[in-house]
């Protein structure tokens, strides 16, 4: 037994411990933190109502915050639970609040003997809340934690207590900031004090820094002395109402942020007298020394979360609720619904079939007594045939009949009509009556017991009267009938609900209206509002003011993005109102940057781009009116911080604000606004005609004590007392101005000029509209209204073409009027001009001009371009398309650099016209309008650049430096690259700001962006004029262009530029004016005229009047020019164009260039140059001419087989070896022409491949005969030189524009001295002999070779003729491959360099100059033919040929290697300058 005792003892102890340990304390112990104010019941505080349960409240910072508790005595709670409070420095989670048992109390008393009194006070810190006899107990604690305990044993309490007792709010908690008490917390304390006074029959008071409550003069305040806690318990500022107390002075102690103090008051003590200081509590306007109670209006709390949808499929509904904080001290109750419901669309219900309407109930089964009746319904299956409906087919119900009476039956009363069977297209309603009795024979009542009538006679909407399903902005809008409003969730980046109405057009077709986002708030703006509330919760004023600065900065950044909804604008107005109120309450002076940001935010909000958003937001709340009030309050907040005679000017893009402070006693001068000459003023203000003149007589108070209702607040309904400032709309608290006697000694005068506010304010009654800018004038304190109107206002129009203008002012007393809030009785219209209207008003307010808009305004808002713009663009486009079609049809014949430039120019004009029409549509989005403006800027500039490109092309053609491939790339860079560069730089610097506005899709007239178009256009016009002057001087110069075709082309380009460029400038200038001022019919008509004329002029100049196009059209029609030979590249034969190969064209161009080449040019203009140019790559630069040292010859390589004669020359007097002289070719208009130099041909055939290179720059073609060129004696020719043989008539008429060569001789030119003959022989060239055929007179023009040779011999093909013409030069091989060209080019260069070296060695010993002179004019070419077949030379001619061949062989082949005189062709005409001009004449021998 002894071993069992310890075991039993351990079991008992375990049970005891198990009973003592209760895990419930964690369930009935709660800790609350962050509670500012609340009233709680037992159910709220204690989830488990048991003894020892506790609820602990945490004070976040006892040094800054004070914790007040009010205990509302409830007898049942006190009797069953005995609640008490314990102030704690530390929170213990498992601390129990049970009272100790009597035995434990004795033990604790014995153990605590000898402890100090402080520890005893700590141990006895529990405060019995029910010890007092009064209904209230007020407690104030400065501890970290306050714990509420249930100390009694409520064994039967939960069951005995009534539900009302459990729900009774017996504890109220209030947390107050000692440094900055808010109006709400002070209002709660005042309410407690009033309730205490009413319950005790006297006034109760306690001290709290920063709070004061109204009381009656002479009343007393007493602290409660009822039985309560022991004297050891100190309750700071505590008031426990109870038993009698000695009377005391009734004064509520107050404090301020500059004079803070706290009083410790024990039970039975009286509060000390405190001085009166300035507070933030309102005071009576009639009795300044008496404090008034703060009026607290009811405020809605945040909406709760939406409930689940009422249906799991199909369409149901969702709801949410919100609670209202009750009003106090006569405040207004909360306005608006407490419950909000919306539709919800779930997934379609999985029903295969659909039941139709129930049929009517059948008759009752019995005529009397109880019975049953049935009804049935049908299943409508739209799917497969096997689908069925789920549910019962029939329905049965009981029918109660009366007992079968023994007497005759009768009908009972009719019941109510049933619901209509259809909602549209005529349904049916039924009602029934019962037969109350039957006859003795059991027969029913006579008559019918059912009655039917039609209902819902309105027709169902047709298919075209239903708006279809649409997916817009990530939202799906279900189909709806016309007139219905559909609600949907906001886009993912916002919260709230969006709505959209299905409208009906004038043609009876339903369409969706614009979605309404007035109830959508972006997440960024909601986060900013939460940040604002966090700053408001801060106790310190300085922190709250700095927080408001951060809020304004963040709001400016959000609005600068310009991506917000209409609901965000209303939310921003509310944020600005809270910021202004916080600045007032905290007495925080905003910095200059804060003021600038604030008004910049307002400028963003009232921008004209937000007109549609404001129209949408006005359907929910008059946000623009609220914004107007907030701006006025902020102006006076800034003005109060200014010094006397100090002013402030803030300028933004959409409003200008002037704030100044003037003393009441002496206003310095009259006030004029705005001051346009101030630095930093915007252009729209500087150039506007808006003006305000406020005479200083208006600025006078009505009386020293009570100013009159005037100023911006002086409109009807806006009068306030001298110590208050009217709050903005929706304010729940008013700003309290300090009771400073100097406050009313200064005027704060504010003036605001709004650029676009008239577009967003509620419109006046139709048909009027706000036609001018809006100006606001506000003065505080309010002034005495003058007896007669003295305020002069001039307002400029923002809508042109208006009629019947009226001056009006905004009436704040009718802010809720639906018809508008403009009042025309306050102002008088003095003068109306074309640009502005002058008004004279009596009261200070917000002013504007109301007028009737023009009739075409409705057409403009429809979104279609005006008729003149459409006509002008259409005519211009049709003309240009005609030009493009003609060029496309004959492109192979008119292809040139000028044609390519013209096509690009036409494309730029076509694109500009299309973009002008697109930009006039009002349905474009912001991004599309910006892109339209940028591309319009680009094509406008490109059209100017292509005109400049045409002028540049004509200039290059005039000076002869035209290289096709290289210049074409430069033309493209100038025509398209330069405009693209200008637009890219403009877009990069402005970030597309200014590209497109709310009124037009073009460059904005503000900010200087328009200079990005005007500047380059002006520079292009100036450069074009300079080039035109240069080209004109070149054409008119005596030594100008000799080539008639070049001269004609250059003149045509110059004339085109002179005509097209001014017309282009006028067209685009009128286009800019027509786009920016869409209501001006004059500008639109001018643009239509200029644009149409531009298209016709371009088509006429470059198509109908262009020679190439005329020739092509004539040849296509079979009418060709008869004066051109068929060898010409532009000639026709039998109505068909003669197509030349590329190589032939290059050869012909080279030959023509030789004849009409300018001085000092260095282009490949001969056959050799053509070959060298063809042998180069496309991107390779052509080589320059071979220029030797000064005084040396310049040779160019020639095509063909070059064999340098290396054989020794025969001796003197010996005949040279027989050889055949190669033909000589000269360049003519039609190509190469072979010269028949019979005096150079030996009798024997020569070897192939020998050439004689004649130097350039010395060829002289002069008419023969006496006195040619002014010389007395004809030039001699070497002895033995053969005379020219006469030509037949057939040969002389075969070539156009060439003179026949009557004589050709070699003579000694005086420019190079005499030739030093090493053999000592003297050569005397014989005098020239006139031709046997003819001798042309000086100055006579002879056409011996016509261009067109009729006859069958000239009917061969063009290609055969070209081959025959170039057969001697072996061009057939050259035309085969490009590689052959390159080989010939490099081979000729190498051989001629060797030949030049031989010539340079013999130049020093030769002093004579050989020249070849020929008859004919200086500007004509020499062409000769071969001798007629069968004609044999005479003996004398043969001897001359031998002597000449001997001389040639001796001089060119057998001279020693010494420096020789260069062999040149010399212009021997006496009328030519001494210094020979540069040329490029080359002849092949």
Curated annotation (Swiss-Prot):
Localization per record: Cell membrane; Secreted
Ranges of residues in domain GAIN-B: 690-857
Skewed-composition ranges (Acidic residues): 1475-1485
UniProt-listed Pfam families: 7tm_2, AGRB_N, GAIN, GPS, HRM, TSP_1
Biased composition (Low complexity): 702-713
Glycosylated residues in this chain: 94, 179-180, 254, 370, 493, 578, 800
Cleaved signal peptide residues: 1-20
Site (Cleavage) residue list: 284-285, 844-845
Membrane topology: Multi-pass membrane protein
GO CC annotation terms, alphabetical: extracellular region; plasma membrane
Basic and acidic residues bias (residue ranges): 1272-1282
Modification(s) after translation: Glycosylated. Autoproteolytically processed at the GPS region of the GAIN-B domain; this cleavage modulates receptor activity. Additionally, furin is involved in the cleavage at another site, in the middle of the extracellular domain, generating a soluble fragment.
Homology family: Belongs to the G-protein coupled receptor 2 family. Adhesion G-protein coupled receptor (ADGR) subfamily.
Name used for this protein in its record: Adhesion G protein-coupled receptor B2
Originating organism: Pongo abelii
């Amino acid at each position: 037994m002894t071993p069992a005792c310890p075991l039993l003892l351990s079991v008992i102890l375990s049970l005891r411990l198990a009973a003592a340990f209760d895990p419930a304390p964690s369930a009935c112990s709660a800790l609350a933190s962050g509670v500012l104010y609340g009233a709680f019941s037992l159910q709220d505080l204690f989830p488990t109502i048991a003894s020892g349960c506790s609820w602990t409240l945490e004070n976040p910072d006892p040094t800054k915050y004070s914790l007040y508790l009010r205990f509302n005595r409830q007898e049942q709670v006190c009797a069953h639970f005995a609640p008490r409070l314990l102030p704690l420095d530390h929170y213990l989670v498992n601390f129990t609040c049970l009272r100790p048992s009597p035995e434990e109390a004795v033990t604790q008393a014995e153990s605590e003997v000898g402890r100090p009194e402080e520890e005893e006070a700590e141990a006895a810190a529990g405060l019995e809340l029910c010890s007092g006899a009064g209904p209230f107990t007020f407690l104030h604690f400065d501890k970290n934690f306050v714990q509420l305990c249930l100390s009694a044993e409520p064994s039967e309490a939960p069951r005995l207590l009534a539900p009302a007792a459990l729900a009774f709010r017996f504890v109220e908690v209030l947390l107050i900031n000692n440094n900055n008490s808010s109006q709400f917390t002070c209002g709660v304390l005042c309410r407690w004090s009033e309730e205490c006074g009413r319950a005790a029959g006297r006034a109760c008071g306690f001290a709290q820094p920063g709070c004061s409550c109204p009381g009656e003069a002479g009343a007393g305040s007493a602290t409660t002395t009822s039985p309560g806690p022991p004297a050891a318990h100190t309750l700071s500022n505590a008031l426990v109402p109870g038993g009698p107390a000695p009377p005391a002075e009734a004064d509520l102690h107050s404090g301020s942020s500059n004079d803070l103090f706290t009083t410790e008051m024990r039970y039975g003590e009286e509060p000390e007298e405190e001085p009166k200081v300035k507070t933030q509590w309102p005071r009576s306007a009639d009795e300044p020394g008496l404090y008034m109670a703060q009026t607290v209006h009811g405020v809605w709390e945040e909406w709760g979360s939406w409930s689940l949808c009422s249906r799991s499929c199909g369409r149901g509904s969702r709801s949410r609720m919100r609670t209202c904080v009750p009003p106090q001290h006569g405040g207004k109750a909360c306005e608006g619904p407490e419950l909000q419901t919306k539709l919800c669309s779930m997934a379609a219900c999985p029903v295969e079939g659909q039941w139709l309407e129930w049929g009517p109930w059948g008759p009752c089964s019995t005529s009397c007594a109880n019975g049953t009746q049935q009804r049935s319904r049908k299943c409508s299956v739209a799917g497969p045939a096997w689908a069925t409906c789920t549910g019962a087919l029939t329905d049965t119900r009981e029918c109660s009949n009366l007992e079968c009476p023994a007497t005759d039956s009768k009908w009972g009363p009719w019941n109510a009509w049933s619901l209509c069977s259809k909602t549209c297209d005529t349904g049916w309603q039924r009602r029934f009556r019962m037969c109350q009795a039957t006859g003795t024979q059991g027969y029913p009542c006579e008559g019918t017991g059912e009655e039917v009538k039609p209902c819902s006679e309105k027709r169902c909407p047709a298919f075209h009267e239903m708006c279809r399903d649409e997916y817009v902005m990530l939202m799906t809008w279900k189909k709806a009938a016309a007139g219905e409003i559909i609600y949907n969730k906001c886009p993912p980046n916002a919260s709230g609900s969006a709505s959209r109405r299905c409208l009906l057009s004038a043609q009876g077709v339903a369409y969706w209206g614009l979605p309404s986002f007035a109830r959508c708030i972006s997440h960024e703006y909601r986060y900013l509002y939460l940040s604002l509330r966090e700053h408001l919760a801060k106790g310190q004023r300085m922190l709250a003011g700095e927080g408001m600065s951060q809020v304004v900065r963040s709001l400016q950044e959000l609005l600068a993005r310009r991506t917000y909804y209409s609901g965000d604008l209303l939310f921003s107005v509310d944020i600005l109102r809270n910021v202004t109120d916080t600045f007032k309450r905290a007495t925080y002076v905003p910095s200059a940057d804060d003021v600038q940001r604030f008004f910049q935010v307002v400028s963003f909000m009232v921008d004209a781009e937000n007109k549609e958003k404001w129209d949408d937001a006005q359907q929910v709340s008059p946000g623009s009116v609220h914004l107007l009030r907030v701006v006025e309050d902020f102006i006076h907040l800034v003005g109060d911080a200014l010094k006397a005679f100090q002013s402030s000017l803030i300028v933004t893009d959409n409003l200008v604000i002037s704030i100044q402070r003037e003393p009441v006693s002496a206003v310095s001068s009259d006030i004029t606004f705005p001051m346009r000459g101030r630095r930093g003023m915007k252009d729209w203000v500087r150039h506007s005609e808006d003006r305000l003149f406020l005479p200083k007589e208006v600025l006078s108070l009505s009386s020293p004590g009570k100013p009159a209702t005037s100023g911006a607040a002086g409109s009807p309904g806006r009068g306030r007392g001298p110590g208050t400032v009217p709050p903005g709309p929706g304010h729940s608290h008013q700003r309290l101005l300090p009771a400073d006697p100097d406050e009313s000694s200064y005027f704060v005068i504010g003036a605001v000029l709004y650029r676009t506010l008239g577009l967003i304010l509620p419109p006046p009654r139709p048909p009027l509209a706000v036609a001018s800018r809006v100006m606001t004038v506000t003065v505080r304190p309010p002034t005495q209204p003058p007896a007669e109107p003295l305020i002069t206002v001039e307002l400029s129009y923002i809508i042109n073409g208006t009629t019947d203008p009226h001056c009006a002012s905004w009436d704040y007393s009718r802010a809720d009027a639906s018809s508008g809030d403009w009042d025309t009785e306050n102002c008088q219209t003095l003068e109306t001009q074309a640009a502005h209207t002058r008004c004279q008003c009596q009261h200070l307010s917000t002013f504007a001009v109301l007028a009737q808009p023009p009739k075409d305004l409705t057409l403009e808002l429809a979104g279609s371009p005006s008729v003149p713009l459409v006509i002008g663009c259409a005519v211009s486009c049709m003309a240009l398309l005609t030009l493009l079609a003609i060029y496309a049809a004959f492109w192979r014949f008119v292809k040139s650099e000028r044609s390519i430039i013209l096509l690009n120019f036409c494309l730029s004009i076509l694109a500009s016209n299309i973009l002008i029409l697109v930009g006039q549509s009002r349905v474009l989005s912001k991004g599309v309008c910006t892109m339209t403006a940028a591309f319009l800027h680009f094509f406008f500039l490109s059209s100017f650049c292509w005109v400049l490109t045409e002028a540049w092309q004509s200039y290059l053609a005039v000076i002869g430096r035209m290289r096709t491939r290289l210049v074409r790339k430069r033309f493209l860079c100038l025509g398209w690259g330069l405009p693209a560069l200008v637009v890219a730089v403009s877009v990069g610097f402005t970030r597309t700001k200014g590209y497109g506005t709310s009124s037009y899709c073009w460059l904005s007239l503000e900010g200087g962006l328009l200079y990005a178009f005007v500047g380059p256009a002006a520079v292009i016009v100036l450069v074009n004029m300079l080039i035109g002057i240069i080209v004109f001087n070149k054409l008119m110069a005596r030594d100008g262009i000799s080539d008639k075709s070049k001269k004609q082309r250059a003149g045509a380009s110059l004339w085109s530029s002179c005509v097209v460029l001014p017309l282009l400038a006028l067209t685009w200038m009128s286009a800019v004016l027509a786009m920016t001022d869409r209501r001006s019919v004059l500008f639109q008509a001018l643009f239509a005229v200029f644009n149409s004329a531009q298209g016709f002029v371009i088509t006429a100049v470059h198509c109908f009047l262009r020679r190439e196009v005329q020739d092509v059209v004539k040849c296509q029609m079979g009418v060709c020019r008869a004066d051109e030979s068929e060898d010409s590249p532009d000639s026709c034969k039998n109505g068909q164009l003669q197509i030349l190969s590329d190589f032939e064209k290059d050869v012909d161009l080279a030959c023509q260039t030789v004849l009409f080449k300018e001085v000092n040019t260095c282009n490949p203009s001969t056959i050799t140059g053509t070959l060298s140019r063809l042998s180069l790559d496309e991107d390779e630069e052509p080589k320059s001419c071979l220029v030797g040292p000064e005084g040396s010859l310049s040779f160019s390589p020639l095509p063909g087989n070059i064999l340098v004669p290396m054989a020794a020359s025969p001796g003197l007097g010996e005949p040279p070896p027989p050889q055949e002289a190669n033909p000589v070719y000269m360049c003519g208009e039609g190509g190469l022409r072979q010269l028949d130099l019979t005096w150079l041909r030996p009798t024997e055939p020569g070897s192939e491949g020998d050439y004689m290179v004649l130097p350039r720059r010395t060829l002289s073609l002069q008419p023969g005969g006496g006195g040619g060129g002014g010389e007395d004696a004809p030039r001699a020719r070497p002895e033995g030189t053969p005379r020219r043989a006469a030509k037949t008539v057939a040969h002389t008429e075969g070539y156009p524009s060439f003179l026949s060569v009557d004589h050709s001789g070699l003579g000694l030119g005086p420019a190079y001295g005499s030739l030093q003959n090493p053999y000592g022989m003297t050569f005397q060239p014989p005098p020239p002999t006139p031709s046997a055929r003819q001798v042309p007179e000086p100055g006579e023009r002879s056409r011996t070779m016509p261009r067109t040779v009729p006859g069958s011999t000239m009917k061969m093909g063009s290609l055969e003729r070209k081959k025959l013409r170039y057969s001697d030069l072996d061009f057939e091989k050259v035309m085969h491959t490009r590689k052959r060209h390159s080989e010939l080019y490099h081979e000729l260069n190498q051989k001629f360099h060797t030949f030049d070296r031989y010539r340079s060695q013999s130049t020093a010993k030769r002093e004579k100059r050989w020249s070849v002179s020929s008859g004919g004019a200086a500007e004509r070419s020499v062409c000769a033919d071969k001798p007629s077949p069968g004609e044999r030379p005479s003996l004398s001619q043969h001897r001359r040929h031998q002597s000449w061949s001997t001389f040639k062989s001796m001089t060119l082949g057998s001279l020693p290697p010494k420096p020789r005189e260069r062999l040149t062709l010399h212009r021997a005409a006496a009328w030519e300058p001494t210094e020979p001009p540069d040329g490029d004449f080359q002849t092949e021998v």
